[in-house]
From Swiss-Prot:
Protein known as: tRNA N6-adenosine threonylcarbamoyltransferase
Transmembrane segments: none
Protein encoded by which gene: tsaD
Keywords of this entry: Acyltransferase, Cytoplasm, Iron, Metal-binding, Transferase, tRNA processing
Coiled coil: none
Domain of life: Bacteria
Function summary: Required for the formation of a threonylcarbamoyl group on adenosine at position 37 (t(6)A37) in tRNAs that read codons beginning with adenine. Is involved in the transfer of the threonylcarbamoyl moiety of threonylcarbamoyl-AMP (TC-AMP) to the N6 group of A37, together with TsaE and TsaB. TsaD likely plays a direct catalytic role in this reaction.
Cofactor comment: Binds 1 Fe(2+) ion per subunit.
Record-listed substrate binding positions: 133-137, 166, 179, 183, 271
GO biological process: tRNA threonylcarbamoyladenosine modification
């Protein structure tokens, strides 16, 4: 089975070819990070225009690397939700054009499910499990049962963790994206430099706006007093607090649901402190932590193709998986609100 995956939900244009749910024949990505750097974040209109400019070229590169043609493709998987609506529409429209021209069925994929299924490309995942999804736009704890039903049991009430990293990095003058820089700075700083109060929110939900505000207020106060501090110390205090919260809530969810596996997913799953600390704390409770390789943490089309593979595999009737040419992009859609796959 050959699935062509298409991903364009934010600022990466990606097309991949995945065979039989395990073999990545190609996974090409055209990133826009350098373009958006000067703005300190993703500009939706620019992102959409870049997708239009790049998507045909990325397709050609992916097909060439996979050594196939469109005639060899059995299914087209495309991200349709959630994301920047203009960016989503580029990928969805491109998928519909290919489907119409070559009579290939379209399988719509939820972007967050794609991130979680990235783990299935590299691991034998034991279900049920808990997944911590952490990215620039999302922070969720999701329970996945034996039948691949996705149940959202926790979410951020304000900023996503990746968004908070970018905002703190902007205050510290570290550039965009902020996550990788803060990750490196953590090991050079003192995580106990600034005591940050952890927000009290219900059960498995998160709140990061107060932590971000504490960093901003401290920086402003120091500037008003003409006092200096080590940026590494403030970055370490911020990241240490955030990772503590992520680990504690995720582990509590895993214990309550009595699962033996935790999956990390999303761009922030590449964070070295989060990986090591969650793995260490989970091991104390007899729980295994798995996460994708670095190349599969960020937005990519291989994970979208993989999600489509399991959508087909678990469907009673494969035609229930298909979308027509009236498929549209959806900017906001909780993973629990989509039909189970």
């Amino acid at each position: 089975m050959i699935i062509l995956g298409i991903e364009s939900s934010c600022d990466e244009t990606s097309i991949a070819v995945v065979k039989d749910g395990k073999e990545i024949l190609s996974n090409n990505i055209s990133s826009q990070i350098e373009i958006h750097k000067e703005y300190g974040g993703v500009v939706p209109e620019i992102a959409s225009r870049q997708h239009i400019k790049n998507i045909a070229t990325v397709l050609e590169e992916s097909l060439e690397e996979a050594k196939i043609t469109l005639d060899d493709v059995d299914y087209i998987a495309v991200t349709y939700a959630p994301g920047l609506i203009g960016a989503l529409l580029v990928g969805v429209s491109f998928a519909k054009g290919l489907s119409y021209a070559k009579n290939i069925p379209i399988i719509p994929v939820h972007h967050i499910k794609g991130h979680m299924y990235a783990n299935f490309l590299e691991h034998d995942v034991e279900l049920p499990c808990i997944s911590l999804v952490v990215s620039g736009g999302h922070t969720n704890i999701i329970y996945i049962d034996e039948n691949h039903n996705f149940i959202n049991i926790g979410e951020t009430l304000d900023d996503a963790v990746g968004e908070s990293c970018d905002k703190v990095a902007r205050v510290l003058g570290l550039g965009y994206p902020g996550g990788p820089v803060i990750d490196k700075m953590y090991y050079k700083g003192d995580r106990d430099f600034l005591k940050i109060t952890k927000p009290k929110v219900s059960r498995f939900d998160f709140s990061f706006s107060g932590i971000k505000t504490a960093i901003i207020n401290f920086d402003n106060n120091m500037k008003m007093k003409n006092q200096e501090y080590k940026k590494e110390d403030l970055a370490a205090s911020f990241l240490g607090t955030v990772v503590d919260i992520l680990c504690d809530k995720t582990l509590n969810a895993a214990v309550e649901k009595n699962v033996k596996t935790i999956m990390l997913a999303g761009g922030v799953a590449a964070n070295s402190l989060l990986r090591s600390q969650l793995t260490e704390k989970a091991a104390e409770k007899g729980i295994k932590v798995i996460y994708p390789s670095m190349k599969l943490c960020t937005d990519n089309a291989a994970m979208i193709a993989e999600a489509a593979y399991y959508k087909l595999k678990n469907a009673k009737n494969e035609k229930d998986c298909f979308a027509g040419l009236d498929l549209n992009g959806v900017a906001s859609l909780m993973v629990s609100d989509e039909k189970a796959i």
